[in-house]
Amino acid sequence: MAKNPNEARVPQSNLVGVVIIAAVLGFISITSLPYIIPGKKVVSYEASLFTFIQTAIENLSILPTTSLLILSGGFVGYLKPENWRLLGFSTIVLFPIASIFEMFLNPTTHNLWPLEFLVYGVLSIPPLIGALLGSKIGVRI
């Protein structure tokens, strides 16, 4: 039997799995919406290596994306309340990784990368709030 009630939910050894879940949920929260919102006119971008990601970022819908990011953060924060900060940031981690990868392969892209990373930082706020709320809910249950 676990000494801490939080340990009974997800063992510490599964932190990597929850980080992967957080990254996938964040990726889906941002990239899927431009393609599934009815009536949304999507402008496609073909210049980058990851055209799917660029098209999704350029056609971002603020309110639905923010809502999904808060829910994603809340879910992973509930699973691992003691690691809510890491999990909140993990929801956005695939986007800077893709940008860095793209910058190495094609150095002429991402000329405004500091601004781009600032946007990723701003996009990490909703899942951080969700992860904090999820961790508080998880501790009480």
Question: For the regions a protein language model found, what residue spans apply to each?
Answer:
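Hydrophobic transmembrane helix segments
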Residues: 23-66
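Membrane-water interface at the C-terminal end of transmembrane alpha helices
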Residues: 17-18, 124-141
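Membrane-helix boundary connector in multi-pass membrane proteins
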Residues: 99-118, 140
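N-terminal membrane topogenic signal
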Residues: 6-23
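Membrane-helix interface "capping/anchor" motifs
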Residues: 76-89
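Hydrophobic, membrane-inserted alpha-helices
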Residues: 68-76
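Alpha-helical transmembrane segments of polytopic membrane proteins
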Residues: 54-69, 115-126
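Aromatic-anchored segments of alpha-helical transmembrane domains
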Residues: 23-35, 89-103
